[in-house]
A protein has these predicted regions:
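Core catalytic lobe of class I
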Residues: 2-234, 239-241
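Conserved SAM-binding loop
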Residues: 244-245
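Conserved phosphoryl-transfer catalytic core
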Residues: 249-252
């Protein structure tokens, strides 16, 4: 599967059996076979002013059509037992919720509570991002609960509880990356590795193949390699591709 992409004249970096491509994801999709991907993580532009990549959409409808086209391609690539995660802005979440229902079973409507950021004076502070967790088959998909359990406050008091902990809530309190944190790189919407790790651990097994069509700073790609998964990362913007490749070289040697 990955060989079909590496044979193409894309600018790309091969790392640990995975590939990170500098291209538009719609130029790469044709080289990905139907039902060949175990999980997809979509972190698309948000139709907000967060960098040059958000200025390409002429209207809200134009943006939503772009998102639906992405979902359709990812649906084609995904195995019947596969999972798809997609981030979006709060403003777009209702539209994308309805859109996803046409193609998937929505298993969870997760909230990434990220804190940080500037507190506005005329409205409540925006401190979370929606994250949809979807599956092709609600009865048959990879779900590794034991790999993501969190400690229960009652763990020491009730011996009947699972010693590995409880299932995480649907609100994930994982701090955003700000300032000079060790993993911070020059990217406006970089996701923390802790967040990416949880997504990948719960929905895939070792040696599974993950598709990341908007790979950005490379966080999901780094997590996949750390966790012994294969991945196809795609990033259109050359400046962020270069940032990610430098980061991958550091993490993956």
């Amino acid at each position: 599967m990955i060989d079909r992409i590496t044979e193409q004249p894309f600018c790309q970096a091969r790392i640990s059996g995975s590939t990170f491509v500098n291209a538009d994801c719609f130029d790469v999709f044709p080289f990905i076979e139907d039902k060949s991907i175990d999980a997809v993580i979509i972190d698309p532009p948000y139709f907000e002013v967060k960098g040059n990549f958000d200025f390409v959409f002429k209207s809200e409808n134009d943006y939503l059509q772009f998102i639906e086209n992405t979902i359709i391609e990812c649906k084609r690539c995904l195995k019947d037992s596969g999972s798809l995660f997609i981030y979006c802005s709060q403003e777009m979440s209702a539209y994308i919720d309805l859109m996803l229902r046409k193609y998937f079973a929505i298993k969870n409507r997760l909230i990434w509570f990220r804190s940080g950021g500037v507190s506005p004076k005329k409205k409540f502070k925006v401190s979370h991002e929606p994250l949809f967790y979807c599956v092709n088959d609600i009865k048959n998909h990879t779900w590794n609960l034991d790999d993501i359990r969190v400690k229960s406050i009652y763990a020491d008091k009730d011996k009947r509880l699972n010693p590995l902990g409880k299932s995480p809530d649907d609100v994930w309190c994982i701090p955003n990356l700000v300032g000079k944190k060790n993993e911070k790189v020059p990217h406006p919407t970089q996701k923390p590795l802790e967040l990416c790790d949880r997504i990948i651990k719960c929905s895939t097994n070792e040696n599974d193949l993950i598709l990341i069509p908007f790979a950005g700073s490379g966080s999901e790609f780094v997590s996949a390699i750390k966790l012994n998964r294969k991945s196809i990362g795609i990033e259109k913007e050359k400046q962020y591709y270069d940032v990610a490749v430098r980061r991958l070289s550091k993490y993956c040697g």
